[in-house]
Amino acid sequence: MANRPNGAVRRRAGPFLALLAGAFAAVAPATIDAAPRIVSLDQCADQYVLALAPRDEIAFVSKRALNADSNQRSRAVGLPEHRATLETVLGARASIAVRYWTPDARLPDALRRQGVEVVQLDEANDFAGIRANVRKVAAVLDERATGEALIDKMDAKLAASRGAWGGARALYLTPGGFTAGRDTLVAAMMGAAGLVTAAAGVGYRPVSLEQLVLDPPSALVLGFFRDLAGGRQRWTIGGNSYLRGLAARRTLVSLPGSQLGCPAWYAADGVLAMARAGQVR
């Protein structure tokens, strides 16, 4: 028993050990049970965080959370906004970061090395992909019921829209002169309303004015025209008399960026808008 401290040492150490134990008792539960601090690193991540996370757990949103094309912008009012950097995320003491795309591709790994859990949203070209994204984020945030409620609302709108256009063909068109072929979320949205994209090929691609003049589409679905009018586009309908006439005669619906900009559950709002246009034609 030579290594056992004598009574005097134990008596002197007693108050210190009691104080230390009390400190751990006070701090440990707060550390273990503390609510997560959640940040969103870009505008698409904003939508998921704002819809799924409790407001008091959101440390900050992106600098684009209040933009006109941010679907959940009303929920972002009053929340801190920051550009996504290693310094801002660590400075916010974030425990969870949600990301779709950021200019710095190294940021997710840098955050993980610092102990931040990074939830990466996947590119979703259909509604199954959107369901998977909602469930992924909801699971990490421990908000599964909220996530399922979003999915249920989305699916109800899709069910109400099904087959509205009966297979009619339409060309999707943006102010920058792009259209959507197969394997795009826009094509999936059109298909959910009973439309077939008139664009050949796969993915998003430019369409020329000459093509529109020589082979005019029987119907148009416009996207982003409410949000992106102005000089940033290569061409616009407003700047061309032929296109103005074509749009006036053949536009089925004009969808805002707040329904198109991110692969999220509210894409079903755009589907429903297309379907309703078909129901009143």
Please report, for each region that a protein language model flagged, where it lies by residue.
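Basic- and aromatic-lined ligand-binding clefts that recognize polyanionic substrates
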Residues: 36-49, 144-195
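Short secondary-structure boundary segments
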Residues: 42, 101, 202, 223-227, ...
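Alpha-helical, coiled-coil/dimerization segments enriched in small aliphatic residues
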Residues: 63-67, 75-78, 180-205
